[in-house]
């Protein structure tokens, strides 16, 4: 048995012993979905993966856009209310408390990723967390008020890593 399997089995036993009947995992990489499925977990949030294709011409920037090339706790902290507000609008998601949010952003920076934000009149209107992988950049989360924020975030992330394919996830439309 591998170390990861043993660790997960010990964690599941500990949860059972404590009477915890429900647990979640958020796979950091795509290959983990299959691994966790083999351990009895199922996918409950169905994201669609899209490849960003830049427009033939650059869309003029009408928003203020900010990023940092190294983890900046103040930058991340100031964006948490926007992140929290936008995530709470979703029908299905895991709501991260502030400390988990900071850990997620900091971990992205440890993987050479970056947090990006758009603003209108100094008010956040878009948020993206992008992490480079071997031959692509994955936008782990993309939140925006309008299509303009979405476009400007993706355009700037692509320009930052121009030699890599840019992929991002979207939630499926909820009917009813």
Predicted regions mapped to residue ranges:
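Short, amphipathic alpha-helical segments
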Residues: 5, 9, 26-30, 73, ...
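Conserved acetyl-CoA-binding loop-helix of GNAT-fold acetyltransferases
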Residues: 1-13, 38, 147-158
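Small-side-chain structural scaffolding
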Residues: 1, 11, 23, 27-28, ...
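Conserved GNAT acetyl-CoA-binding A-motif
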Residues: 8, 15-28, 161-172
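Conserved active-site alpha-helix within GNAT-family acetyltransferase domains
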Residues: 17-22, 28-47, 173-176
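Amide-forming acyltransferase catalytic core, primarily the GNAT-like/NAT-type
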Residues: 42-143, 147-151, 155-156, 169-172
């Amino acid at each position: 048995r591998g170390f990861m399997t043993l660790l997960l089995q010990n964690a599941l036993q500990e949860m059972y012993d404590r009477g915890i009947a429900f647990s979640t995992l958020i796979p950091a990489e795509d290959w983990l979905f299959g691994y966790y499925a083999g351990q009895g977990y199922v996918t409950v949030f169905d994201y669609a993966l899209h490849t960003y294709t830049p427009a033939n011409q650059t869309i003029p920037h009408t928003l203020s856009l900010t990023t940092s090339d190294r983890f900046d706790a103040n930058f991340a902290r100031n964006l948490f209310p926007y992140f929290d507000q936008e995530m709470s609008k979703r029908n299905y998601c895991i709501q991260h408390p502030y400390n988990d949010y900071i850990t997620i952003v900091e971990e992205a920076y440890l993987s050479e990723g970056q947090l990006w934000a758009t603003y209108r009149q100094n008010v956040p209107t878009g948020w993206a967390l992008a992490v480079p992988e071997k031959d692509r950049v994955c936008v782990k989360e993309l939140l925006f008020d309008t299509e303009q924020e979405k476009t400007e975030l993706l355009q700037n992330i692509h320009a930052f890593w121009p030699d890599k394919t840019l992929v991002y996830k979207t939630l499926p439309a909820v009917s009813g």
